[in-house]
Regions:
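Short, well-structured beta-strand
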Residues: 2, 6-11, 16-17, 24-25, ...
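Low-complexity intrinsically disordered segments
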Residues: 70-73
Length: 178
């Protein structure tokens, strides 16, 4: 698990608005029409442009249904291996409500992650990242069943055991009260 303190560019006033902010930030970053070299910014756009160019060269001259199916399967596979839009959901674990999203599809990628974001204040959130890497087909088969249920079997239990409290210095409270 990786824990990050993150600041989002827009203000939010609850978990539902945080969900919308995270989804838009993700889309703006990975789907940026102008990819930035040596970063992941615009990576989905770049990957899909390459996939479309290849599919056009490979299958545009053929018009039968089998070729169209092959082309569509190729493009769908590339879409799922890139960075398709995410969908955030609200989930309450213990005393906290998180904005949760899944990145990656185990059927298409060897990296899969679930991210739980806990809103703090002033556009800040704590981001808990559970990242999984699958190596080889055998490990994928063995690990797949566990991975698909790990959000409830493992991640939720970890997050429920966290004790998160506001850090308040009693000296600062005494000064501000005077």
């Amino acid at each position: 698990m990786i824990v990050r303190l993150k600041k989002v560019p827009q203000s939010f006033d609850g978990i539902e608005s945080l969900n919308a902010v995270i989804e838009q930030e993700y889309l703006d970053f990975y789907h940026d029409p102008v990819p930035v070299e040596r970063t992941l910014r615009g990576r989905h756009t770049e990957d899909m442009n390459h996939a479309s160019e290849y599919a056009k060269k490979r299958w545009d001259d053929y018009s039968d249904d089998e070729d169209k199916k092959s082309r569509d399967a190729y493009i769908l596979g590339n879409y799922m291996r890139a960075y398709p839009p995410i969908k955030c959901t609200s989930i309450t674990l213990g005393k906290q409500t998180y904005s949760k999203y899944v990145e990656g599809d185990i059927n298409y990628k060897h990296i899969f992650q679930r991210v739980y974001n806990l809103p703090l204040k002033d556009n800040y959130m704590l981001s808990f990242l559970f990242k999984y890497r699958l190596e080889g087909e055998e490990s994928k088969k063995k690990f797949r069943k566990w991975l698909l249920s790990s959000d409830e079997a493992f991640e939720h239990k970890v997050l429920e055991t966290l004790e998160i409290s506001r850090l308040v210095d009693p000296q600062l409270n005494a000064i501000s009260a005077k």
